[in-house]
Amino acid sequence: MADFFSVQDISLCLGGRQILDHVSFSVDTPGRVIGLLGPNGGGKTTLLRAICGELPHDGHVFLEGAELAGLRSKELARRVSYIPQLSGISISMSAIDVVLMGFYPKLKLLSQPSADMRAAALRALEQVGMAGLADRDYLTLSGGEKQLVILARTLVEDTKLLLFDEPDSSLDLGNKYRMVRMIMEL
């Protein structure tokens, strides 16, 4: 039986420097929480970005037996969610609109989200304790609030593989605990 998820011989050079050198590992069953540990600058973020297709690399990544490199970006987005340390969102939009971005793979370009999608987005914001900020401009939120909104977006994406890059780095102690608990429940 094939592994649920496997990384085989991932190698990557950036700026002439070898960042990843034949990295391999596998996860046999879904629902597992796996951590990548290593020093600052050790390539953890680079590996996550390579796995989700953001960085070109040598080697192979498989999810449920399908090689991710062969998938179109929309199909890849249906299967894999990457949650970076910083969201990269730099345009003014409400917190609920950020969460609604999680439905992108299921929406046609420029289509309006349905009432059901809006309700699901609001439930996700409620789940992470941010429902009261649904209409606030995302750019005005604190770093921790932004991370919780991004977690809410991840909840509506409903993908098979979630890749978190330091998801609790901007959170206070209480929200760190809540974030870890929510990740374990996904």
Model-assigned labels for residue ranges:
Residues D137-L141, E145:
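Conserved ABC ATPase signature
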Residues L162-E166:
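Catalytic Walker B motif of ABC-type/P-loop ATPase nucleotide-binding domains
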Residues D28, G59-E67, L76, L173:
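Conserved ABC transporter NBD signature motif
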Residues L36-P39:
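The feature captures the beta-strand-to-loop junction immediately N-terminal to the Walker
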